[in-house]
Each structure stands twice: as structure tokens, then as C-alpha cells.
Amino acid sequence: MSKVCEICGKGPSFGNNVSHANNKTSRTWYPNLQKIKAVKNGTVRSIKVCTRCIRSGHVTKAL
């Protein structure tokens, strides 16, 4: 589960590339994950967090 945010659980989503000829090939959208050192359960850990959680303040960064 390496491409999943450890705070909100956001992971990859799936869909299709669609060309002008309406050909469809499968593709994947990944969340914008950053490795940060954050305080989780009272200890400092290196976790993968999406930028939405960082910006909205769901994570307290370690100093």
C-alpha cells in the first residue's frame, strides 16, 4: 500500500485515456504524496501524506 495517504486513505484512481479516434486505454491517476516527518500517535515518524492533508492542517510536522 505504498501509494496511499496514511491520513485520509486517498489512493490511486483508475480510468481511460481517450484519443481523438475514441480509442480507450486504461490509465491510473496517483495522489500527490510527499514523504514528511510528522508526529503520529506521539512519536515522530516518516509517513506518506497527500498534499491536501498537509495544506488543510491534518498533519503536524516534526520540528
UniProtKB/Swiss-Prot annotation:
Pfam families (alphabetical): Ribosomal_L28
GO biological process terms held by the UniProt record: translation
InterPro entries tied to this protein: Bacterial_rp_bL28 (IPR050096), Ribosomal_bL28 (IPR026569), Ribosomal_bL28/bL31-like_sf (IPR034704), Ribosomal_bL28_bact-type (IPR001383), Ribosomal_bL28_sf (IPR037147)
Gene3D superfamilies, A to Z: 2.20.150.30, Ribosomal protein L28/L24
Coiled coil: none
GO cellular component term of the entry, any: ribonucleoprotein complex
Superkingdom in the source lineage: Bacteria
Keywords: Ribonucleoprotein, Ribosomal protein
A single GO molecular function term of this UniProt record: structural constituent of ribosome
NCBIfam families on file: L28
Similarity section: Belongs to the bacterial ribosomal protein bL28 family.
Listed name of the protein: Large ribosomal subunit protein bL28
Species of the source: Geotalea daltonii (strain DSM 22248 / JCM 15807 / FRC-32)
Gene from which the chain derives: rpmB
